[in-house]
A protein has these predicted regions:
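Beta-strand/loop edge motif enriched in small/polar residues
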Residues: 25-235
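Repetitive helical segments and hydrophobic/amphipathic motifs
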Residues: 11-12, 16
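Bacterial N-terminal signal peptides that target proteins for export
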Residues: 1-10
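C-terminal motif of bacterial Sec signal peptides marking the signal peptidase cleavage site
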Residues: 19-23
Length: 235
């Protein structure tokens, strides 16, 4: 009985050793593959955006002059992306009627629009701002008007449910400047924006004109913060 037991234990030990050695040999053959690292690119936006486009958090994104998201086009911005407005050209982003901006950040990874100047040198009005133009109803005879601060874009229409996209968990900093007398670009300007649009958890700070301004429209914005604007915080 004892001899049989000892033989069984010895056999089990040998098998375990054999399989253990084989397993170790297999591990030595494994190759660890590192996940690809996304390279940083310099992305300069200028003129018209005429096809769908996505801005990535890994890139250096710059607005140069007036940048237009045209009718039928969607500009998507990843959470955590930083977009800088060029001071020398007063970079500005204008979403025209029929265009869409999908800027949906998160509480942990907000989307930030800010100045291209060094952090210690940023100030009021370094760049233009963000303008949304929709097809919702407005209170004038023509039913449409040219947007304040936008040299060519119109807003207004007959669709109260119009959708200009999503602006959520977004910060807008050091924007706002007078394009012409009584025609200023604000931090966030909404012209005829419809209730199909989502505007939530948006903070505008250190704006050179109004932090937020609305011209007609039916959008229901909520959770907005205006901090130390030069003119009106909400207009």
């Amino acid at each position: 009985m004892n001899k049989l037991l000892l033989k069984g234990v010895a056999a089990a030990f040998c098998m375990a050793t054999m399989f253990g050695t084989t397993a170790c040999g297999d591990d030595d053959d494994l190759v660890n593959v590192e996940p690809p690292v996304e390279k940083t690119q310099d992305v300069i936006l200028e003129g018209e955006i005429t096809s769908d486009m996505t801005l990535k958090a890994a890139d250096n994104n710059l607005l140069r002059g007036f940048v237009y998201v045209t009718d039928g086009v969607t500009l998507t911005i990843e959470p955590g992306t930083v977009i800088k407005g060029e001071k020398s050209s007063k970079g500005s982003l204008i979403v025209e009627r029929g265009g869409k901006l999908i800027a949906e950040g998160t509480a942990e990874k907000p989307i930030v629009f800010t100045s291209d100047q060094p952090k210690a040198s940023r100030t009021y009005g370094d760049w233009g701002g963000l303008i949304l133009c929709g097809k919702s109803i407005v209170n004038n005879t023509a039913g449409e008007a040219q947007i304040e601060g936008g040299p060519r874009s119109y807003y207004g229409g007959k669709d109260p449910e119009d959708n200009s996209g999503i602006v959520k968990y977004v910060r807008i900093e050091f924007a706002g400047y007078p394009l012409e007398p009584n025609k200023e670009i604000n931090g966030l300007t909404c012209g005829g924006v419809g209730r199909g649009t989502t505007i939530e958890y948006v903070q505008v700070s250190f704006c050179g004109d109004d932090s937020f301004e609305w011209f007609g429209g039916t959008v229901n914005a909520k959770h907005l913060i205006a901090y130390k604007g030069w003119d009106d915080e909400f207009d």
